[in-house]
């Protein structure tokens, strides 16, 4: 990976921060998955969420097939962070940036795995569990669905997690070979 070339491209995007990471730095926790199961209304409703993504162990194995990655963060302002509808509506801009970064990475990589903020909203009604995903190339599972403590990774790289007042931080993790 030519990091200088990629960094020059990243400088053109409205990223809050980014960091090159190794998968050895990732911390996986069943507790993160438990939050999906008990608090997220998307649990068991899409291909991008548990249980469709597999067990935490299966997710860990899929992730650890890669050695390196790129953690990207964007921030957005909302009028009221407690308004979950407004907050979630801001994910679309982050996902668009994630797709741009993925295309940059793919120019230099032989394989990628992208995890992001999505519980997937590409289809009005997800085919889970009755039929295969209609758009697997567009769907990025949520980082947390894989049991990854993204805030721990961000902290290791000095990326501040803003979820206070009216600022929201969104993260994506693009793994590559």
Model segments located where?
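Catalytic cores of enzyme domains
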Residues: 3, 16-46, 50-177
């Amino acid at each position: 990976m030519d990091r200088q070339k990629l960094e020059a491209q990243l400088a053109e995007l409205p990223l809050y921060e980014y960091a090159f990471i190794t998968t050895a730095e990732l911390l996986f926790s069943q507790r993160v998955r438990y939050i999906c199961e008990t608090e997220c209304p998307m649990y068991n409703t899409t291909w991008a969420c548990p249980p469709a993504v597999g067990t935490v162990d299966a997710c860990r194995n899929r992730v650890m097939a890669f050695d390196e990655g790129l953690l990207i963060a964007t921030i957005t302002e909302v009028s009221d962070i407690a308004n979950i509808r407004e907050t979630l509506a801001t994910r679309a801009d982050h996902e668009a940036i994630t797709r741009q970064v993925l295309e940059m990475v793919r120019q230099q990589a032989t394989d990628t795995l992208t995890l992001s903020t999505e519980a997937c909203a590409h289809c009005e009604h997800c085919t889970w569990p009755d039929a295969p995903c209609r758009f697997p190339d567009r769907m990025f599972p949520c980082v947390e669905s894989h049991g990854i403590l993204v805030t721990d990774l961000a902290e290791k790289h000095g990326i501040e997690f803003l979820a206070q007042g009216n600022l929201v931080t969104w993260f994506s993790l693009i793994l590559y070979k």
